[in-house]
C-alpha cells in the first residue's frame, strides 16, 4: 500500500492574496483538490495534507468538498500541521509521529502542481516497486530549464547527482533533465534519514532533495508530457495552467466526437460530460457537473453550470445553472434557468424568460418576456408574453400551479399562492389572485371604458383656459 503526503503549507506570497495558494481555483477545483483527485486511482492507504498558512481554512475547504472527490476510493483525509515553513524536508519530518508503524511506500506530491495525470503517478509507483528503490524521482526534460536544478543519471536511469542551477558548470547546464518535485520513497529508509537533515544553506531551510545522496538506489522516471509538472507560483502561472488544462480537455472531447466551432473561445471544465455529436458554439462555457446529451447545440454566448441538457436540445445566448432540460427543447435567446428548474421535452423557453425553481411539463411554451418562479406547469401549457408569477409577499415565497393545456394571455400576473386547473384560459392583462377551476376563462382586469369625443372636449377646455389667461 502507498501513503500520500501533499505539501500544502505555503502561503504563496507571489499570488498577492490572503487566500492560501493551494486554494486558488483551476477550473472547477482548487489546486490542492486537483492534486488529491490525481492520486485517488492508486487507492492509497491514507492521504495526509501538510498544512501551515491558514491551515484551518485549507482543512475546511477540503472536508467540505470531500464528497466531490471520490468517496469509493478516497480514504479520510488527514491533516498534519507544519507550524513553521522551514522547507520541504522539514514538512516531511512532520510525518514521523504519524507513520511510526508504517513500512510501505510514501508518495510525495506538491499542492501547487495540479496537472499531473493519474497515469503518470501510477508509472512512478510501479517503477519504484518493481525496482525496489529507496527513492524514485519524477523528472522532465524541459525545453527551457532555466531556474531548475539538474538531475544526472547513469544509463539505467539511476540518479548519480542533483546539481542546483547556480552550481552547474557550463557543460552541466546543457542537461535539460530537471526534478519535478514528485517522489516515491521507501518510508522506513526515508524515516531513518529525515532526522539527519541540516539547514546548511542560504535560506536556512531543510530540503527534501538533500536526502537523495543518502539513499540507494534512487531512480528517475521521465514524465511523458513536461507540462504535467507545471507549478503555480503567481497569477500568470495560474492562467497558463488553465490554458494547458483547457487544451487537454477540449482535445479529448474533439477526439471523442464533439464539435467545437471555435475552441479558443470555449471553456469546458474537466468535470463535464459531453455525448457524441454535441456542437458547442463560440463564446460558450460549460462548467461543473454539467452533462450535455447527444445532438444538442450549445451557444453561441451561453453558460451551462451544474446542469443536465437532454438530447437534440438547443441553447442560444442563455444561462442555465443547477437545472435540467429534457430532449428536443429550445432555450433562448437570452433565457435564464436557475435554482433547480426542470424543463420537459419539446418545450420552448424563449426570449428574456427567467425560470427559478420552476417545473415545465412536456410541450409547454414560455416564449417571451416572462418570470416563472416557484411554479409548476403541466403539459401543453402556453405562457403569454409578459406573464409573471408573483411569488414573493415580502416575507416568504409561494407556489403557482398551472394545469395541462392552460394558457395565459399577455401581461398576466398570477399572484401566488394560486392554482389554475386544466384547460384554463387567462385573459390578457389579468391579475389572478384566486384559484381557478378546470375549463374556465378568468378575467381579472378593469372593464374597458370608451369616452367618445373626449379629445375634442379636452381641447375645448384647454382653449377656454388659454383665453382666460390672455391679457
Swiss-Prot record:
Note describing how the cofactor binds: Binds 1 Mg(2+) ion per subunit.
Catalytic activity: alpha-D-glucosamine 1-phosphate + acetyl-CoA = N-acetyl-alpha-D-glucosamine 1-phosphate + CoA + H(+); N-acetyl-alpha-D-glucosamine 1-phosphate + UTP + H(+) = UDP-N-acetyl-alpha-D-glucosamine + diphosphate
SUPFAM superfamilies assigned: Nucleotide-diphospho-sugar transferases, Trimeric LpxA-like enzymes
Main location group: cytoplasm
UniProt-annotated binding residues for acetyl-CoA: 385, 391-392, 410, 428, 445
Region (Pyrophosphorylase): 1-235
Compartment(s): Cytoplasm
Keyword Nucleotidyltransferase set for record: yes
EC category name: transferase
Gene Ontology molecular function, alphabetical: glucosamine-1-phosphate N-acetyltransferase activity; magnesium ion binding; structural constituent of carboxysome shell; UDP-N-acetylglucosamine diphosphorylase activity
Residue positions binding UDP-N-acetyl-alpha-D-glucosamine: 7-10, 21, 82, 87-88, 149, 164, 179, 233, 338, 356, 371, 382
Catalytic activity, EC: 2.7.7.23, 2.3.1.157
CC annotations in GO: carboxysome; cytoplasm; membrane
Region: N-acetyltransferase, residue numbers: 257-471
Cofactor requirement: Mg(2+)
Assembly information from the UniProt record: Homotrimer.
NCBIfam families: glmU, PRK14360.1
Family the UniProt entry places it in: In the N-terminal section; belongs to the N-acetylglucosamine-1-phosphate uridyltransferase family. In the C-terminal section; belongs to the transferase hexapeptide repeat family.
Protein name, entry field: Bifunctional protein GlmU
Biological source species: Trichodesmium erythraeum (strain IMS101)
Amino acid at each position: 500500500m502507498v501513503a500520500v503526503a501533499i505539501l500544502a503549507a505555503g502561503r504563496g506570497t507571489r499570488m498577492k492574496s490572503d487566500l492560501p495558494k493551494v486554494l486558488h481555483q483551476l477550473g472547477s477545483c482548487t489546486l490542492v483538490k486537483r492534486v488529491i483527485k490525481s492520486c485517488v486511482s492508486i487507492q492509497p492507504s491514507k492521504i495526509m495534507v501538510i498544512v501551515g498558512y491558514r491551515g484551518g481554512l485549507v482543512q475546511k475547504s477540503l472536508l467540505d468538498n470531500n464528497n466531490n472527490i471520490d468517496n469509493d476510493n478516497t480514504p479520510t483525509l488527514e491533516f498534519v500541521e507544519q507550524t513553521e515553513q522551514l522547507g520541504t524536508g522539514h514538512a516531511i519530518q512532520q510525518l514521523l509521529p504519524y507513520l511510526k508503524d508504517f513500512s510501505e511506500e510514501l508518495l510525495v506530491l506538491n499542492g501547487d502542481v495540479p496537472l499531473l495525470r493519474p497515469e503518470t503517478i501510477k508509472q512512478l509507483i510501479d517503477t519504484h516497486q518493481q525496482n525496489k528503490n529507496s527513492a524514485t524521482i519524477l523528472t522532465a526534460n524541459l525545453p527551457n530549464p532555466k531556474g531548475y536544478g539538474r538531475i544526472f543519471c547513469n544509463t539505467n536511469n539511476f540518479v548519480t547527482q542533483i546539481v542546483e542551477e547556480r552550481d552547474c558548470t557550463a557543460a552541466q547546464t546543457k542537461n535539460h533533465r530537471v526534478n519535478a518535485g514528485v517522489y516515491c520513497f521507501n518510508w522506513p529508509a526515508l524515516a531513518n534519514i529525515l532526522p539527519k537533515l541540516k539547514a546548511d544553506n542560504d535560506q536556512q531551510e531543510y530540503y527534501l532533495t538533500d536526502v537523495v545522496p543518502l539513499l540507494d538506489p534512487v531512480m528517475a522516471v521521465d514524465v511523458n508530457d513536461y507540462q504535467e509538472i507545471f507549478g503555480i507560483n503567481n497569477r500568470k502561472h495560474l492562467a497558463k495552467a488553465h490554458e494547458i488544462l483547457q487544451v487537454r480537455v477540449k482535445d479529448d472531447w474533439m477526439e471523442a466526437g464533439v464539435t467545437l466551432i471555435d475552441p479558443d473561445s470555449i471553456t469546458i471544465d474537466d468535470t463535464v460530460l459531453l455525448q457524441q455529436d454535441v456542437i458547442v458554439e463560440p463564446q460558450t462555457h460549460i462548467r461543473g457537473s454539467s452533462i450535455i446529451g447527444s445532438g444538442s447545440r450549445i451557444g453561441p454566448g451561453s453558460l451551462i453550470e451544474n446542469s443536465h441538457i437532454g438530447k437534440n436540445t438547443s441553447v442560444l445566448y442563455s444561462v442555465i445553472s443547477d437545472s435540467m432540460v429534457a430532449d428536443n427543447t429550445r432555450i433562448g435567446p437570452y433565457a435564464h434557468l436557475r435554482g433547480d428548474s426542470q424543463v420537459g421535452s419539446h418545450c420552448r423557453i424563449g426570449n428574456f424568460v427567467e425560470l427559478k425553481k420552476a417545473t415545465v411539463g412536456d410541450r409547454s411554451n414560455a416564449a417571451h418576456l416572462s418570470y416563472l418562479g416557484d411554479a409548476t406547469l403541466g403539459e401543453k401549457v402556453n405562457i403569454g408574453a409578459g406573464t409573471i408569477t408573483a411569488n414573493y409577499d415580502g416575507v416568504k415565497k409561494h407556489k403557482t400551479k398551472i394545469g395541462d393545456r392552460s394558457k395565459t394571455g399577455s401581461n398576466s400576473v398570477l399572484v401566488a399562492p394560486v392554482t389554475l386547473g386544466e384547460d384554463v384560459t387567462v385573459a390578457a392583462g389579468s391579475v389572478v389572485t384566486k384559484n381557478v377551476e378546470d375549463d374556465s376563462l378568468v378575467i381579472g382586469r378593469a372593464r374597458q371604458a370608451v369616452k367618445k369625443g373626449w379629445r375634442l372636449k379636452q381641447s375645448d377646455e384647454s382653449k377656454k383656459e388659454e383665453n382666460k389667461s390672455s391679457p
